[in-house]
UniProtKB/Swiss-Prot annotation:
N6-(pyridoxal phosphate)lysine modifications at: K190
Biological classification of the source: Bacteria, Bacillati, Bacillota, Bacilli, Bacillales
Protein name: Phosphoserine aminotransferase
Predominant location: cytoplasm
Enzyme Commission code: 2.6.1.52
Pathway: Amino-acid biosynthesis; L-serine biosynthesis; L-serine from 3-phospho-D-glycerate: step 2/3
Length: 356
C-alpha cells in the first residue's frame, strides 16, 4: 500500500528524484564526495546553478530582462525584502486574501504605509480586485494562491504600478504570465524542492543599489552567488525541474492538477459527510480545505486516514478542519485514494449512525 502525504509544505517530492538524490548523497562527481560536501564555488556545482536557472527560465518562459535569484529565509523574508528594496514613496498596496497576505502586510508596515484592498468575488465565484483602488503606491502585492483558505486569483486586472506576487503554493503548478509581474517569489518546499530555498524572479529595472544590509539587497544577488547558498536544496530543485520538464512542463502539471482537484471537489460536492469550504471558480488547484462540520468527526477522519497511509490531512492550526494539498509530485492515484478513503469513512459513519 502506497503512503501519501497531503502536507501543505514541505510537500511530496517525486520518487524518482529522491532515488537519484539518494545515490548522490554518497557520491556526486568524485567517488566518496557527497553533493552536500561539494563546494558552492566548484565547477561541478556551478553547472547545477546554471542548469537550475535555465530550466526555470524554460519552464516559466522568463525573459532576459528578469533576474532569477536563489535566496534563503523562506518566502517570509521576502515580506520584508520587497518593501525594503522597492520603496520610493514608502506607500504600498496589498490585496488581503487571507493569513499569508496579512503576514506580508504586517511586515511591510515597518517600511511605510499600507493600503489594504479587499478582493472581489464575481457571479461564478472567481476572485479579482478593483484596479481603480491602486493609486500612488510603489507596488501592489497579491498572494496568487492562498494555501490556508484554499482560494486563488482567477483574474488580475491591469495596473500602472509593479505587480508583486507570492506564488509559493502554485509556482510550476499552473501557468503564470511572468511578464505581468515586477516580482514573483516563492518558497521552494511545495513544488520546487526541499525547504531551505526561495526563488525571486525580479524585473531588472526594479533592482536598485540601496543603503541596506548587504544580504538584504536584491542587487547583491544578481548573476552571482553572494554567499554560501543552500547547496543541497538547489541540487534537489534542479532535479525536480528536470522531472517537470520530462513530464511535459507546466502545462502538463496544470492539466494534472486540475484532474486531481476535480476528483476531490466532485466527491465533496456529492458527499453527505464532507463539504468543501470554498465554492466557485476561485477554488485552489493545489490546496483543498474541507470539513465534516464537526471537529470531533474531522479528527476521527484524520486518524482513520492515517491508519490507511494518508498523512497530514489536518487543517491549518488557525482554522482547523481538514485540508488536502495536491502539489505537482502528488500523483493522480493519490487524489483517487483520498476519495476512496473518504467514501469508505462516510459509509462506515452512516452505518454506525443507523445502528445507534
Amino acid at each position: 500500500m502506497s503512503t501519501y502525504t497531503y502536507s501543505a509544505g514541505p510537500g511530496m517530492l517525486p520518487t524518482e528524484v529522491m532515488q537519484e538524490i539518494q545515490q548522490h548523497l554518497l557520491t556526486f562527481e568524485y567517488e566518496g564526495v557527497s553533493i552536500i560536501e561539494t563546494s558552492h564555488r566548484s565547477a561541478s556545482f556551478q553547472r547545477v546553478v546554471d542548469s537550475l536557472e535555465w530550466r526555470l527560465r524554460r519552464l516559466m518562459h522568463i525573459p532576459e530582462n528578469y533576474a532569477v535569484l536563489w535566496l534563503q529565509g523562506g518566502a517570509t523574508l521576502q515580506f520584508s525584502m520587497i518593501p525594503m528594496n522597492l520603496r520610493k514613496q514608502n506607500r504600498f498596496a496589498y490585496v488581503d486574501t487571507g493569513i499569508w497576505s496579512k503576514k506580508a502586510m504586517e511586515d511591510a508596515k515597518h517600511f511605510g504605509e499600507v493600503d489594504v484592498i479587499h478582493p472581489l468575488v464575481d457571479a461564478t465565484g472567481g476572485m479579482s480586485f478593483e484596479s481603480s483602488l491602486v493609486q500612488e503606491v510603489d507596488y501592489l502585492h497579491v498572494t496568487l494562491n492562498n494555501t490556508i483558505e484554499g482560494t486563488r486569483f482567477t483574474h488580475i486586472p491591469e495596473i500602472d504600478v509593479p505587480l508583486i506576487a507570492d506564488a509559493s503554493s502554485n509556482i510550476l503548478a499552473e501557468q503564470i504570465d511572468v511578464e505581468r509581474f515586477g516580482v514573483i517569489y516563492a518558497g521552494a518546499q511545495k513544488n520546487i524542492g526541499p525547504a531551505g530555498l526561495t526563488v525571486v524572479i525580479i524585473r531588472r529595472d526594479l533592482i536598485q543599489s540601496l543603503q541596506l544590509p548587504s544580504y538584504l539587497q536584491y542587487a547583491s544577488h544578481v548573476d552571482t552567488l553572494f554567499n554560501t547558498p543552500s547547496t543541497f536544496s538547489m541540487y534537489a530543485a534542479e532535479r525536480v525541474l528536470k522531472w517537470v520538464e520530462d513530464c511535459g512542463g507546466v502545462e502538463a502539471m496544470e492539466r494534472l492538477n486540475r484532474q486531481k482537484s476535480d476528483r476531490i471537489y466532485s466527491y465533496l460536492e456529492e458527499s453527505t459527510c464532507f463539504s468543501p469550504i470554498v465554492t466557485g471558480e476561485r477554488r485552489s488547484l493545489t490546496n483543498i480545505p474541507f470539513s465534516t462540520g464537526n471537529q470531533e468527526l474531522d479528527q476521527r477522519f484524520e486518524r482513520y486516514a492515517l491508519e490507511r497511509g494518508l498523512l497530514e490531512l489536518g487543517g491549518h492550526r488557525s482554522v482547523g478542519g481538514l485540508r488536502a494539498s495536491l502539489y505537482n509530485a502528488m500523483p493522480l492515484e493519490g487524489a483517487e485514494r483520498l476519495v476512496d478513503v473518504m467514501r469508505a469513512f462516510e459509509e462506515e459513519t452512516h452505518v454506525s449512525h443507523q445502528n445507534i
